[in-house]
């Protein structure tokens, strides 16, 4: 079995910690697998991108919104639930509980490129910050746009 790359295993994006399990170069540039920890109050606003992704909820209770033709409605998800996001579908997620949410994320390699560029490396003793500055949000949004992501105006 080939040893996977372990360089910068953990990064933070918008207060969410991502730990690489498989990088795109480990899968012949096909897909990525990441473990995510989303602390209370963290989340990603409604957005869309050309890559498919899927979330498997491991621990905690999160809220996901996925466009369904009638709009965007938030739905509670729990351990064992899977949320599949087809390409170009508007979606968002958040943790409004008082406990961390842990999930497994599988995505196409193109989305992995975004995570590689936008992620801020975490040292062994660091964890994701609870509060994200406006400057950091703007930095991530600019990188997201460069990678084909769109953030529709709230309805």
Each model region followed by its residue ranges:
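A short, N-terminal "cap"/entry segment at the start of jelly-roll beta-barrel domains
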Residues: 1-31, 127-155
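Conserved short histidine dyad/triad with adjacent acidic residue
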Residues: 17-20, 34-48
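Short acidic-glycine-tyrosine-enriched beta hairpin
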Residues: 26, 54, 69-87
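Histidine-centered catalytic micro-motifs
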Residues: 45-52, 89
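Glycine- and acidic-residue-biased ligand/ion/polar-headgroup-sensing regions
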Residues: 51-63, 67-68
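Ligand-binding loop in jelly-roll beta-barrel domains
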Residues: 79, 87-112
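A hydrophobic, small-residue-rich beta->alpha segment in the mid-to-C-terminal subdomain
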Residues: 113-127
